Curated annotation (Swiss-Prot):
Catalytic activity from the UniProt record: Hydrolyzes single-stranded DNA or mismatched double-stranded DNA and polynucleotides, releasing free uracil
Species the sequence originates in: Helicobacter pylori (strain J99 / ATCC 700824)
EC number: 3.2.2.27
Broad class of where this protein is predominantly found: cytoplasm
HAMAP family membership: UDG
Compartment list: Cytoplasm
Gene Ontology MF: a single term: uracil DNA N-glycosylase activity
Enzyme class: hydrolase
Name of the featured protein: Uracil-DNA glycosylase
Length: 233
């Protein structure tokens, strides 16, 4: 079986990225990921959610990109069943999962900047459906092992996705939180897209709270689209 048999990807993205899927680097990603899936190890997110960010935000609908690093590797209990927190969107978690510290800080800053009520749920699917691509640079992870799938090669794929998206004529708003994400600035054509940077929202990082990052995002969105982005959840 092929990757897309385990991890469905929308037709719009298959067409947008069709040339990538034939390249040796992607065939190697596919091989390594499928080997990991078939191993005794538990892989997050569920394979059916691997391409959730793409399936909720078609390439022609992308207006904002919020780049994450790799999926949450933790679990939570629901009805005595252990379930993955990760659900295929950067920073987002399953509807009934506890809200992680980084996402709590995102919600705090969003409330401080724009007055958006702090949600009781950490599922950001609504943002994705409104045109925010919630993309992790690395798309999968082994349970309880942060950055364990760096070896698979996902970053080469996510870089190509960004490069292809940056070819668009409409300015994209690219939100890069933390030093790892900010390395992607090198991929962005100068004077074409709007780059917004801030420290990572992790409590281990300093400077995110009070950065005004969402004020900057909303200002940029108004400049490009003449309306506000709806951050409500």
């Amino acid at each position: 079986m092929k990757l897309f048999d385990y991890a469905p990807l929308s037709l719009a993205w298959r067409e947008f990225l069709q040339s990538e899927f034939k390249k040796p680097y992607f065939l190697e990603i596919e091989k390594r990921y499928l080997e990991a899936l078939k191993s005794p190890k538990t892989i997050f997110p569920k394979s059916s959610n691997l391409f959730c960010a793409f399936n909720l935000t078609p390439p022609y609908a992308v207006k904002i990109i919020l780049l994450g690093q790799d999926p949450y590797h933790s679990t939570y209990l629901e009805n005595e069943q252990e379930l993955p927190v990760a659900m295929g969107l950067s920073f987002s978690v399953e509807k009934n999962a506890p809200i992680p510290p980084s996402l709590k800080n995102i919600f705090k800053e969003l409330h401080a900047n724009l007055g958006v009520p702090v949600p009781c749920c950490g599922d950001l699917s609504a943002w994705a459906k409104r045109g925010m691509l919630l993309l992790n640079a690395i798309l999968s992870v082994e349970k309880n092992q942060a950055a364990s799938h760096k070896y698979i090669g996902w970053e080469a794929f996510s870089d190509q996705i960004l490069i292809r998206l940056f070819e668009t004529t409409t300015p994209l708003i690219v939100v890069l939180l933390g030093k790892v994400a900010q390395k992607k600035i090198a991929l962005i054509p100068k004077n074409k897209h709007i780059i917004i940077t801030a420290p990572h929202p992790s409590p281990l990082s300093r400077g995110f709270l009070g950065s005004g990052v969402f004020t900057s995002v909303q200002k940029a969105y108004r400049e490009v689209y003449r309306k506000d982005f709806d951050f409500s959840l």
